[in-house]
């Protein structure tokens, strides 16, 4: 995947990251019997974060000025695809996908010097983890309908409300919480606030597990939680703008993970088709199997090409609203189809609980919901292609 990326330093980095997975992460997984559906001990995650940070991988996607390697977005996509395709349970933590630098990288410009030192630099060093808390029980795609409130009380803000399905919350140290600070405004004034999750009144609840089986989501409840006003992130009333500033690139950066997962299912299907024997020979000789493999290969090539082009647009500073939505829509649906064909090729093995292909099928089904459903992506695309040039609309 992404074989056209031939910058020598990046080629060496890709190889080094995969060696790290094979030589350091897989032994940890074997020793502790960790798979993607295990409850990951926080001390183990911190070891991985810190070690990845020491090696320069954890912050690789950040600018050099912030201690990163200044990877382009297309290079970051290639690394993410490699890690997802590796099948390692701890692979998402190499780049800090679930609470590390990628969660905050494009928002660091909004941080005050104090916030950088107290919250974000520890994230970059692998010492702290964060999560982005927007979704609520009654507020999914309709982000402006959130009800979590932050009310001024002298130099403090008092926060009340509930956040739902927050990715990375089970192992986060603090959250970037979207709060209503002026419910009377039209639309409601939304402000981002940095909230330590060990404060009195904060409860992180793990009452559900998504169909992927991964313990990576939780609800966060705030009951009269007091935080200093200096924890306002990005300015009062700028929360929605801040959230939208990350959404397009965030949608794009989910796509290489889908691609890597689908690629792993495709590779497994190739191996299985060559080794599984029926009626006197390998099932790969049957045209029905060949056609499924051909469709999978074509879909993966199309997805990789679309991701690479969209990432190149992002690197050039282009407006990604339509492109990122189209990419997320297309890649999520095609990669799920690849996983479905992989299950079909594997037969009864493919529907056995815990088989890698079965796990990949469940993971990829979720991506048609996460970070904006397929229907929301279609809405965004339709708005972009139907509105007059220059019209400003949110994603």
Summary of predicted features, one role per range:
Residues 131, 147-149, 174-178, 192-194, ...:
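Conserved hydrophobic/aromatic beta-strand scaffold that supports enzyme active sites
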Residues 119, 146, 162-164, 205-208:
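Short beta-alpha junctions and helix-cap segments that line functional grooves
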Residues 145, 198-228:
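Flexible, small-/acidic-enriched active-site or ligand-binding loops
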Residues 91-114, 140:
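N-terminal glycine-rich flavin-associated loop
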């Amino acid at each position: 995947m992404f074989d056209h990326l031939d910058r020598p330093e990046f080629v060496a980095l890709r190889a080094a990251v995969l060696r790290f997975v094979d030589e350091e992460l897989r032994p940890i997984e074997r020793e502790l019997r960790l798979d993607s559906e295990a409850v990951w001990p926080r001390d183990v995650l911190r070891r991985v974060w810190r070690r990845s940070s020491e090696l320069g991988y954890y912050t690789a996607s950040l600018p050099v000025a912030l201690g990163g390697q200044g990877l382009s977005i297309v290079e970051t996509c290639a690394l993410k695809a490699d890690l997802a395709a590796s099948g390692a349970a701890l692979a998402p933590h190499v780049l800090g996908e679930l609470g590390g630098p990628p969660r905050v990288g494009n928002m660091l410009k909004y941080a005050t010097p104090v916030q950088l030192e107290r919250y974000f630099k520890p994230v970059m060093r692998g010492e702290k983890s964060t999560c982005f808390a927007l979704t609520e029980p009654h507020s999914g795609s309709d982000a402006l309908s959130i009800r979590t409130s932050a009310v001024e009380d002298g130099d403090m803000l008092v926060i009340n409300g509930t956040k739902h399905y927050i990715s990375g919350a089970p192992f986060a140290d603090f959250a970037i919480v979207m709060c209503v600070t002026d419910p009377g405004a039209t639309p409601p004034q939304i402000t981002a606030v940095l909230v330590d999750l060990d404060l009195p009144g904060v409860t992180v609840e793990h009452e559900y597990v998504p169909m992927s089986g991964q313990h990576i989501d939780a609800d966060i409840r705030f009951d009269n939680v007091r935080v200093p006003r200096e924890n306002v992130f990005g300015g009062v009333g700028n929360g929605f703008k801040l959230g939208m500033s990350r959404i397009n690139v965030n949608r794009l950066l989910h796509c290489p993970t889908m691609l890597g997962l689908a690629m792993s299912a495709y590779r497994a299907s190739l191996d299985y088709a060559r080794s599984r024997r029926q009626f006197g020979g390998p099932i790969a000789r049957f045209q029905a199997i060949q056609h499924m493999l051909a469709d999978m290969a074509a879909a993966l090539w199309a997805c990789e090409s679309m991701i690479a082009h969209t990432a190149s647009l992002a690197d050039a500073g282009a407006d990604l609203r339509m492109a990122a939505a189209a990419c997320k829509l297309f890649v999520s649906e095609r990669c799920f189809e690849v996983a479905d064909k992989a299950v079909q090729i594997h037969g009864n093995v493919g529907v056995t609980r815990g088989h890698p292909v079965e796990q990949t099928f469940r993971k990829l089904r979720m991506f048609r919901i996460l970070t904006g459903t397929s229907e929301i992506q279609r809405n965004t695309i339709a708005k972009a292609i139907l509105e007059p040039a220059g019209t400003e609309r949110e994603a």
